[in-house]
Regions:
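Glycine-rich flexible loops
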Residues: 1-253
Length: 253
């Protein structure tokens, strides 16, 4: 029988997963989600399952301590990774976790992070498969993008999904934290997709939704002659306004 905390996390993850799927931000087996159960265990989407139709049985519980040390190992073969993913399961009858479970394990260790979402929205990938990804990541176009996604996003060039990507995410998130004093709310993956993280499912949902909206505006602005970002002083102002902090609390983000 699942603990009460696990039941709550499962319910929120299934809700979030199906919402992402209904929005067509993933198709087939694309994307994944995860949530912390306790200090030792997290739940993550199983390999090949669909976000649009995810059920609780397709959430696999994994041990952090069977995944995180692997990120420091060199020359890990694909066959070894398969074995490591299977061995990370709390129950050996559970479905195999996603190959991207490594980055979920890392991101869920960040202070204040309890949930992670990863999707492949077409508007975002139009940008991430172009030459203007840096502009999209580093600039903001409207106030609510600042409120929901932070003043800047982290852009990571393409890496092979799996262990290599998890290592690059860890390295670049640490650099981002050193520069900005906190982790990014939004991580953009070149030629791949987007990750949002937060303390609640609402934070992950809101950041993902606003990133997709911002991408649609960005693409449209370029079609109409060019992107016009907010001045940096105004971005900083919105990020630190007391009324916007109140809105974040009301939105549970």
């Amino acid at each position: 029988m699942l603990k009460e905390d696990a039941v709550f996390v499962h319910a929120r993850l299934v809700e979030l997963s199906r919402e992402f799927g209904r929005a067509c931000w993933t198709i087939l087996g694309e994307g994944n989600i995860s949530g912390r159960i306790d200090q030792d265990v997290f739940a993550v989407k199983s390999s090949g399952s669909s976000l649009a139709t995810l059920t609780e049985i397709e959430l696999t519980h994994c041990y952090f301590d069977r995944l995180l040390p692997v990120m420091d190992r060199e020359n890990v073969s694909e066959a070894e990774i398969e074995g490591i993913l299977r061995d990370s399961r709390v129950r050996d009858t559970a479905l195999k976790p996603s190959v991207e479970t490594f980055f979920h394990a890392y991101l869920l260790t960040l202070s204040g992070v309890n949930y992670v979402g990863h999707t492949h929205p077409m508007p975002v990938n139009q940008i991430l498969c172009s030459g203007v990804g840096t502009s999209f990541a580093e600039e903001r176009r409207f106030p609510d993008e600042v409120v929901c996604c932070g003043p800047v996003s982290l852009l990571i060039p393409y890496e092979d999904p799996g262990l290599a990507l998890a290592r690059r995410i860890r390295q670049d998130v640490k650099n981002f934290e050193s520069k900005h004093g906190k982790p990014p709310k939004v991580i953009l993956l070149g030629n791949h997709g987007v990750i949002t993280i937060g303390g609640s499912v609402d934070a992950v949902r809101v950041a993902m939704s606003m990133t997709v909206k911002a991408a649609e505006i960005f693409v449209g602005a370029h079609a109409l002659g060019g992107n016009v970002p907010m001045p940096q002083r105004e971005v900083d102002r919105i990020e630190n306004r007391l009324d916007e902090e109140y809105r974040r609390r009301m939105l549970r983000i």
